[in-house]
Amino acid sequence: MRRALPLAFATGLSLLLSAPVQAEPVVTPVAEVVDSADVRRDGERFRHVGSGYVFPSSLGDMPARKVTIFGPGDVSVNYTVKGAAAGDAWVDLYAYPAGDWTIAETADDIASAITNSFGATPALVPAGMEKRADGLHQGWFDGRIGERSFKTGYYAVRRGDWVLKIRATMPSPPTPEALARTAAAVAAVNLGPLPATR
């Protein structure tokens, strides 16, 4: 039995060392985005290669600022006017593989992540932030990061093998300008059927 322990340890260690390491997300300012296996430029817009979803160049008054690739087929585009560091609202629009999860399971996972990351509690949908789409799951929360209070929400749908998700975040209490800008950005997002991919 004792001789089996070193062998088991060595086998486990070799499996651990041979396992692929999760890469860090790759964040690129929009002006520097080049075509890749995950996203391609489409004029001023960005096309998600796997799903064919088109990320617009702006959402309302919020221009696209950066593209993040989290892994194969897992892409987000960040939209903001002044940026979170300047106390402004921002919206992140995601397209990523749905895997084997239902949209209800995905929505539960999103809500748990928000609750854990922001120490957040469920809140009412802010006025003007209502959105409709087939199969839509959504939620809004009040939370904090350090000393700053935020109001943050998500909208998620499953389209075929893909999840489309909006994450909207505003300082809390939001100014009328931030609320209006964020509402316009959320309203501008297309959560309808995906285009036919080539």
Where are the language model's segments positioned?
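Bacterial N-terminal signal peptides
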Residues: 8-16
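Sec/Tat signal peptide C-region and signal peptidase I cleavage site
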Residues: 19-23
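N-terminal "mature-domain start" segment
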Residues: 24-80
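Short, surface-exposed coil-to-beta transition loops
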Residues: 73-78, 88-90, 147-154
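A short acidic-to-branched-hydrophobic micro-motif
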Residues: 76-109
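Long, charged/polar, surface-exposed segments that mediate recognition or autoinhibition
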Residues: 96-130
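Signature of long, low-cysteine stretches enriched in small and polar/charged residues
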Residues: 119-157
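Surface-exposed amphipathic alpha-helical segments
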Residues: 166-198
